[in-house]
Regions:
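Pseudouridine synthases involved in rRNA/tRNA modification
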Residues: 1-33, 83-85, 214-221, 226, ...
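RNA pseudouridine synthases
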Residues: 1-202, 306, 311-317
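Short alpha-helix capping/helix-loop boundary micro-motifs
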Residues: 43-48, 232-235, 272-273
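Short, surface-exposed secondary-structure edge patches
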Residues: 48-52, 237, 278
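Short loop/turn positions at the edges of beta-strands in beta-sheet-rich folds
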Residues: 91, 150, 230, 240-244
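Short, well-ordered beta-strand segments enriched in hydrophobic/aromatic residues
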Residues: 95, 236-239
Length: 318
C-alpha cells in the first residue's frame, strides 16, 4: 500500500486526474476500476472518481509495486549540477527566462538532458523551492514554448495555481508577445497586419500559408512594424495576435521577405553569405495585460518585461 498526502499544489484536482499524474504507469481505465473496487481510497473511505481533492486529504492506494516504478527519464534534471538560466524576473509564483537560440525547450529525439525545462527543474530543486517527494503530481512547468533556434522570453510557473492562471490568460489572449526579427528587403507597407491560414505539413515539419479557409487550416493574425532598414535587411517588430507554429517565419516568407538565417523558409544563398544558420527571430518583449481577474497574479497586471539583449540586432543594426 502507498499513501499520498495532498498538498496545496495538488488540491482542487479531480481524483482520477490526480492519479494520471501521480501514478503515470496506471492506465486510466484501471484507475477507475480500482476506485470502484475501493483499492483506491480517500481518507480511508471510498471516493468517486470526480471527487475534488482537498489540502490535507490522504490517499491510500492498494496497488502492485510495478505501478510505482519511476519512468527512466523522470529525474534527469538531477544530473545537472550547475543549471544555466538567464532569469529576467523571478518571484514566488513565476520566472521569466531568456532562452538562448539553440537550446531546446523540452526533450526531443536529439536532446534529453540539456533542455530549458530540465535546467529550470534543477534550479528550483537545488533552491529547495520544489520538493518532488512532497508535491506528488505537480511539477514546475513552462507556459509557452519557442522553437529551438529562436531565442527569447519563456514563462515558467512555480506552483499549480500560477500555472492554471497563466494557461488561462494565454488561452484568452490576455498577454501581449512581441518579437524582433530581421527579414530580407523592406516590407511594403512598412507597417501592417497579416491575416492568413496556416496548415501543417507533418512530412516536412513546415506550415503552408493560405489566403482563404482550408481544411485543417488555422487562422493566423500578425501585426508588424519596420523599425529600420540597412544593407537590404530590415529590423521588424512583430506582435502575435495568435500563436501558431512557425507563424512569423511562414507569413514573412509568403509576402516575399523571409527571415535572415531561416533554414526552412529562407534563402539559402543569402543565409550563407551572411553566415547565419539560425533564424533572426527573438521573443524580446512581454506584457501582462490581464484585463480580467488574474487571482494570485493580479500584481503583474500592466507590467512589461524586455530581454536584456537581442544578439542579431546589435550585430546588424548597432
Amino acid at each position: 500500500m502507498r499513501e499520498f498526502t495532498i498538498h496545496k499544489n495538488d488540491a482542487d484536482q479531480r481524483l482520477d486526474r490526480f492519479l494520471l499524474k501521480a501514478v503515470p504507469l496506471l492506465p486510466a481505465s484501471l484507475a477507475q476500476k480500482y476506485i470502484r473496487l475501493k483499492r483506491i481510497k480517500v481518507n480511508g473511505a471510498r471516493a468517486e472518481r470526480d471527487y475534488r481533492l482537498r489540502e490535507g486529504d490522504r490517499l491510500q492506494l492498494y496497488l502492485n509495486d510495478e505501478f510505482f516504478e519511476a519512468p527512466s527519464e523522470e529525474n534527469v534534471y538531477l544530473t545537472i549540477a550547475n543549471p544555466k538560466l538567464h532569469i529576467l524576473y523571478e518571484d514566488e509564483n513565476i520566472l521569466l527566462l531568456d532562452k538562448p537560440a539553440g537550446l531546446v525547450v523540452h526533450a526531443d529525439e536529439g536532446e534529453k538532458v540539456n533542455t530549458l525545462v530540465n535546467h529550470l527543474l534543477a534550479y528550483l530543486y537545488q533552491k529547495r523551492e520544489w520538493k518532488p517527494r512532497e508535491e506528488n503530481a505537480f511539477t514546475p512547468a513552462l507556459c509557452n514554448r519557442i522553437d529551438r533556434n529562436t531565442g527569447g522570453i519563456v514563462i515558467a510557473a512555480k506552483n499549480a495555481e500560477a500555472l492554471r492562471v497563466l494557461n488561462e490568460k494565454i488561452r484568452e489572449h490576455e498577454l501581449s508577445k512581441f518579437y524582433l526579427c530581421i527579414c530580407l528587403g523592406r516590407p511594403e507597407p512598412p507597417k501592417g497586419r497579416i491575416e492568413c491560414f496556416l496548415r501543417k505539413d507533418s512530412k516536412t515539419n513546415t506550415v503552408r500559408v493560405y489566403h482563404h479557409p482550408v481544411p485543417d487550416g488555422r487562422s493566423a493574425v500578425t501585426l508588424y512594424e519596420t523599425l529600420e532598414t540597412r544593407d537590404r535587411l530590415s529590423l521588424v517588430e512583430v506582435e502575435l495576435l495568435t500563436g501558431r507554429t512557425h507563424q512569423i517565419r511562414a507569413s514573412f516568407a509568403d509576402m516575399g521577405h523571409p527571415l535572415l538565417g531561416d533554414g526552412k523558409y529562407g534563402v539559402g544563398s543569402v543565409n550563407r553569405r551572411y553566415g547565419e544558420a539560425q533564424q533572426a527571430l527573438y521573443s524580446y518583449r512581454l506584457r501582462f495585460d490581464f484585463p480580467t481577474d488574474a487571482g494570485i497574479l493580479n500584481y503583474l497586471r500592466g507590467r512589461e518585461f524586455i530581454a536584456d539583449e537581442v544578439p542579431f540586432r546589435r550585430k546588424y543594426f548597432g
